[in-house]
Amino acid sequence: KDDIHLDEEKAELGMMAVGYYAILESAFRFNKNLSIENQSDFVAEMYAYFSKVASRNKDAWTDSALDANEIKNITKKNSLQAFPYNKYHCTSWNVNQSAAIIVCSEKIADDLDIPQEKRVYPLASSENNHMIGTLQRPKLYEQHGMQLAAKYILDVCQKLKIEPNFYDLYSCFPVAVQMFAESLNLSDYKKFTITGGMSFAGGPLN
């Protein structure tokens, strides 16, 4: 949101999101006491896995799987956007896709002969608008809105004794994916996506 950016932020970073998320990535890494090299390797391996998942997703915009070195190393095709992010770390503006979730009653689904195995029954959703300007956050590596949204879902799962089978942590930049995972108590990046993520399966503003 434009109204939560301070004048100092706009002067230094402009309004391009990659600069903000790159700073959050560095803060997140520093809080974990990880070296730049170790974090770079981890993110590259995670996104290489995402790319592999997307290559098998018929609805993804790309079917070419990238390896970790292709994502990590700066090249003409993978230029530096804002340290530590290269192009392949970021979502692509040029992707033009759309998707829809159709919500209807069970009677309508019956009338339309929707097979039972094709139906999904939503149990809960969570949204949080607890947004704070980047420079106003006490700790750059903590996202309270994200944590509150995740806690609600985790509490519902606990109450209903549900263990989720699938996750899709879908965001423009790696640090947001990692923060989502941490908020949901996930550590294995092979559980983070079933689509391939926004960088390889989709795009922003679609």
Describe the predicted segments one by one:
Residues 1-108, 114-203:
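Conserved "HGTGT" condensation-loop signature of ketosynthase/thiolase-family condensing enzymes
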Residues 206:
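C-terminal catalytic subdomain
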